[in-house]
């Protein structure tokens, strides 16, 4: 997987997903369930806004002092027997991990869920070496078996599939013969993966939070697969975005409380694991060799700029669960491994406007994402700023839109042209007007009216109305 997950046109992806009634109902149910649970848990926590402000302060502080905490983290990892590699690009990160796999003659690698490894397309890089890479998160495993489908949700990657579809995938690909009952499906995957953990040469994880003061990494999971990935293989590789740091355990506790409640509405996940370095003498499990790969891949270019707040993100998907656009089109429409409002903001920054210039328009700018964010990222404002950059700096607005805006500029700056245009507007739009609205407009208005009605021009202009009003006042 890489940042870009589809080469199809954005409009074609939207049309396809809008016709997928199962996906839309599945996403709606999941959003409602997550939202209800989140509200219940945040209310139990107390003053939620105070918690949000505290989380925002922590994330802002880290970003403003990121160089210091990165140095502290790397120093403490090294003191505990680990190796640290700073990867400026995705290619540098994958090359470093490929080198580890070559040195270990790795035939089998087990992975826990990690968005950053999908961002850098790590699985494909390792498979090029002939390594068998096995996803151990249940949702990611389902998608891997289903011909490497991209995830449709940051937290629940297989959200778009129901139990019958999952059963059919396992039946077609692996000869599964049991029912579609969730407990039977889960037990089947558990038995399939058990031997994989025991025979894997390398374990690879992501990182929810790295703790600078101790050189530890924290993994927040519900399935326990990440614990096995880190406990059984002799070599462990952890891949993290450079911004995923907290200063101490105290800040980690705050952010974990925000994360678990915002993601799926839990007080705590089933497993919160903190790992520090290689195993000590006498330990029965843990890696003999540990590598921490810290990935930049465009993040340093975001630091210090107007989009820096997006690096506060803790990957909870609360914004996704609140988004009305995601509710209707699902995750695959975005064409990026990052979907929802997070993907709308982050994908153009990491992947470029050439591939993701449509995403900032996949938003109503309603602000629901901003209200849901546990660390107060002003998501809808960042999305709006993307639109401004696309038009003003990147010059990527459609030709028809550029011509329309140029014509409007000429007309608005000339009193004579403006007067003529207002007189002509009503009769020109009359064939398209129905009950004072334009429901199917011509030319540049066509795209607009596909999604909403356009108000019809008034037959009586303001100037004409004012002229007659003033004349009437004078006569009276």
Swiss-Prot record:
InterPro entries: 4Fe4S_Fe-S-bd (IPR017896), 4Fe4S_Fe_S_CS (IPR017900), FTHF_cligase-like_sf (IPR024185), Helical_ferredxn (IPR009051), LUD_dom (IPR003741), LutB (IPR022825), LutB/LldF (IPR004452), LutB_C (IPR024569). Residues 304-334, 353-382 form the 4Fe-4S ferredoxin-type domain. [4Fe-4S] cluster 2 binds at residues 323, 366, 369. [4Fe-4S] cluster 1 binds at residues 313, 316, 319, 373. SUPFAM superfamilies: alpha-helical ferredoxin, NagB/RpiA/CoA transferase-like. Keywords: 4Fe-4S, Electron transport, Iron, Iron-sulfur, Metal-binding, Repeat, Transport. HAMAP family: LutB (MF_02103). This is Lactate utilization protein B. It comes from Lysinibacillus sphaericus (strain C3-41).
């Amino acid at each position: 997987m890489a940042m870009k997950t589809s080469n199809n046109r954005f409009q074609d992806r939207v049309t396809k997903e809008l016709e997928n009634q199962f996906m839309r109902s599945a996403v709606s149910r999941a959003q409602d369930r997550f939202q209800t649970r989140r509200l219940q848990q945040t209310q139990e926590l107390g003053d939620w806004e105070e918690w949000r402000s505290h989380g925002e302060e922590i994330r802002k502080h880290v970003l403003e002092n990121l160089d210091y905490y990165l140095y502290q983290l790397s120093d403490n990892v090294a003191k505990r027997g680990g190796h640290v590699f700073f990867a400026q690009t995705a290619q540098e990160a994958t090359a470093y991990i490929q080198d580890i796999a070559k040195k270990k003659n790795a035939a089998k690698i087990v992975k826990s869920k990690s968005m950053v490894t999908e961002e850098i397309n790590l699985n494909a890089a390792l498979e090029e070496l002939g390594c068998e890479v096995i996803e151990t998160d249940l949702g990611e495993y389902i998608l891997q078996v289903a011909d490497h489908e991209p995830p449709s949700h940051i937290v629940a990657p297989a959200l778009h599939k129901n139990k019958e579809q999952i059963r059919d995938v396992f039946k077609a690909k692996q000869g599964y013969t049991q029912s579609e009952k969730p407990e039977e499906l889960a037990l089947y995957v558990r038995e399939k993966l058990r031997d994989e953990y025991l025979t894997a040469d390398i374990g690879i994880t992501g990182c929810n939070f790295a703790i600078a003061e101790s050189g530890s990494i924290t993994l927040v999971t519900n399935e326990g697969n990440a614990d096995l990935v880190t406990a059984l293989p002799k070599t462990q590789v952890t891949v993290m975005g450079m911004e995923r740091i907290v200063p101490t355990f105290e800040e980690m506790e705050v952010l974990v409380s925000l994360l678990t409640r915002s993601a799926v509405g839990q007080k705590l996940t089933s497993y919160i694991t903190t790992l520090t370095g290689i195993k000590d003498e006498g330990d029965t499990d843990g890696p003999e060799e540990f590598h921490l790969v810290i990935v930049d891949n465009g993040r340093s270019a975001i630091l210090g700029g107007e989009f820096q707040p997006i690096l506060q993100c803790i990957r909870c998907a609360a914004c996704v669960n609140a988004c009305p656009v995601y509710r209707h089109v699902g995750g695959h429409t975005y064409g990026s491994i990052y979907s929802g409002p997070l993907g709308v903001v982050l994908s153009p920054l990491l992947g470029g406007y050439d591939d993701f210039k449509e995403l900032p328009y996949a938003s109503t700018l309603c602000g629901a994402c901003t209200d849901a964010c546990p660390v107060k990222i002003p998501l809808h404002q960042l999305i709006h700023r993307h639109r401004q950059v696309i038009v003003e700096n990147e010059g990527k607005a459609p030709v028809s839109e550029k011509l329309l805006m140029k014509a409007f500029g000429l007309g608005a700056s000339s009193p004579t042209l403006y007067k003529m245009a207002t007189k002509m507007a009503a009769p020109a739009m009359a064939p398209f007007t129905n009950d004072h609205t334009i429901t199917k407009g011509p030319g540049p208005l066509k795209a607009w009216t596909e999604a909403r009605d356009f108000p019809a021009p008034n037959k009586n202009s303001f100037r004409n109305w004012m002229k007659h009003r003033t004349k009437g006042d004078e006569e009276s």
